[in-house]
Regions:
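A residue-level marker of the well-folded mature domains of exported/periplasmic proteins
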Residues: 2-9, 22-319
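Repetitive helical segments and hydrophobic/amphipathic motifs
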Residues: 11-14
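Bacterial Sec-type N-terminal signal peptides, specifically the leucine/valine-rich hydrophobic h-region
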Residues: 17-20
């Protein structure tokens, strides 16, 4: 059974909470008596390196790998499961020690993850779950979705029609939808009149939100499952001549912060994540597993917090 553990959103507290005594390159003996290999090489696979969220995650893992003295390689999955399958096979051929994976498809990546484990690679899922991974670190995405939709509902006065820009079939997106559903269940006067999959991207969200607004021109709000989706929805609303729709997202990205800093923007709130911390914590967990130690918790949840135009001045943002 997996145990969930919540980390404070600072690197220091995260590492302390995990008690990562294994963060060295020393070879130790595990319970079976076999010597574990050193962590000399680390790979990171993400859905889309063009997304600033994953660029921040890349920064976190790179810094942690350099602190270990390990070589580091990051790969862009380009939102394509087949690409990620091929990348895992390439990492297997390279014989890397640790693979941190942000899966395009949490279930579909399972066989490739198993191949990596069979080849002796330690695999930890980051930001989204991945079938057969040995551990997972992610934002508390149920909380993130709930906070974003609660903010939206409050700002539209607790009643009205809304649209949802959904995303790819990953655990993080599914959990955000679950959290939003919890907020909606507590507010029966709010009804969802349209839901479409924006593939987590701004351009796709722009197109489908334009179509949904044509069909439902009187909506009061839009929830985007991530900030690129919410930003695309914001542009669609602007192009449709709207000015009073409330739009919320999830991420706390630099682009969202910039958009929300305008008092006239319809983008009103985002549930913040800490991608840098997610990446560095995932590597810390992998090092501990590689050393033969048992994790206190094999699923770690990092809390989210809501950011609005009124709280931007105290929001630290991504690094």
């Amino acid at each position: 059974m997996k145990i969930l553990k919540t980390l404070a959103m600072t690197g220091t507290l995260a590492i302390a909470a995990l008690s990562l005594t294994g963060c060295t390159n020393e070879i130790v003996t595990n319970d079976s008596g076999a010597a574990s290999t050193e962590v000399n090489s680390v790979g990171l696979m993400v859905q889309d390196l063009g997304n600033p969220f994953f660029a921040s995650m890349d920064n976190g893992v790179k810094a942690a790998a350099e602190a270990l003295g390990a070589t580091y390689t990051a790969q862009d999955g380009r939102q394509d499961l087949a690409v990620q399958n091929n990348q895992i096979d390439a990492f297997i051929q390279q014989g890397i020690d640790v693979l941190l994976i942000n899966a395009v498809d949490s279930e579909g990546i399972g066989p490739a993850v198993q191949r990596a484990k069979d080849a002796g690679i330690t695999v930890v899922a980051v930001d989204v779950g991945a079938k057969n991974a040995e551990a997972t670190v992610t934002t508390d995405n149920v909380e993130a979705g709930r906070l974003s939709c609660e903010s939206l509902i409050k700002q539209i006065g607790g009643a009205g029609e809304i649209l949802i820009v959904d995303g790819t079939p990953t655990t993080s997106i599914q959990d955000r939808m679950t959290g939003c559903g919890e907020a909606l269940a507590a507010n029966p006067d709010v009804s969802v009149v349209g839901t479409q999959n924006g593939d987590n991207g701004r351009e796709r969200a722009l197109t489908l939100t334009t179509d949904m607004l044509t069909a439902h021109p009187d909506v009061a709000g839009i929830f985007g499952v991530n900030d690129p989706s919410a930003l695309g929805a914001t542009l669609a609303a602007q192009q449709a001549g709207k000015s009073d729709i409330v739009i919320t997202g999830v991420d706390g990205s630099p682009e969202a912060v910039k958009e929300m800093s305008s008092a006239s923007s319809m983008f009103k709130a985002t549930s913040a994540q800490n991608p840098n911390l997610l990446g560095s914590t995932a590597l810390d967990m992998a090092v501990q597993l590689r050393s033969g130690e048992t994790l206190d918790n094999d699923t770690v949840l990092v809390p989210s917090s809501i950011v609005t135009g009124e709280t931007l001045s105290t929001y630290e943002g991504w690094v």
